[in-house]
Amino acid sequence: MSLSSERKVQVIKEHQCSVNDTGSPEVQVALLSERITQLSGHFKQHTHDHHSRQGLLRAVGQRRKLLDYLKKKDLDRYRTLINKLGLRR
């Protein structure tokens, strides 16, 4: 369950801070959010896929860590990101 290359490039372009930015917390959180959304849809049909569910929980935890880091370092960027992605916090 990975993102297609085209979708990944599109998400990176939407959230990057500069031209070659692929590793900023904003980009990483956006990619994880996209993957979490995709996996959540997968579980509507495949309710007993426990191995993928572990991957989902790992991705949610990683996103939480990145959001906590961003909140600690730059509160304005954090608030902008959660509003842009529509996350509850």
Swiss-Prot record:
InterPro entries listed in its UniProt record: Ribosomal_uS15, Ribosomal_uS15_bac-type, uS15_NS1_RNA-bd_sf
Listed name of the protein: Small ribosomal subunit protein uS15
One biological process term in Gene Ontology: translation
Gene3D superfamilies in the record: 6.10.250.3130, S15/NS1, RNA-binding
Annotated Gene Ontology cellular component terms: cytosolic small ribosomal subunit
CDD domains: Ribosomal_S15p_S13e (cd00353)
Subunit field text: Part of the 30S ribosomal subunit. Forms a bridge to the 50S subunit in the 70S ribosome, contacting the 23S rRNA.
Record's keyword annotation contains rRNA-binding: yes
Role played: One of the primary rRNA binding proteins, it binds directly to 16S rRNA where it helps nucleate assembly of the platform of the 30S subunit by binding and bridging several RNA helices of the 16S rRNA. Forms an intersubunit bridge (bridge B4) with the 23S rRNA of the 50S subunit in the ribosome.
UniProt record similarity statement: Belongs to the universal ribosomal protein uS15 family.
Transmembrane stretches, start-end: none
One GO molecular-function entry: structural constituent of ribosome
Protein keywords: Ribonucleoprotein, Ribosomal protein, RNA-binding, rRNA-binding
Pfam families the record matches: Ribosomal_S15
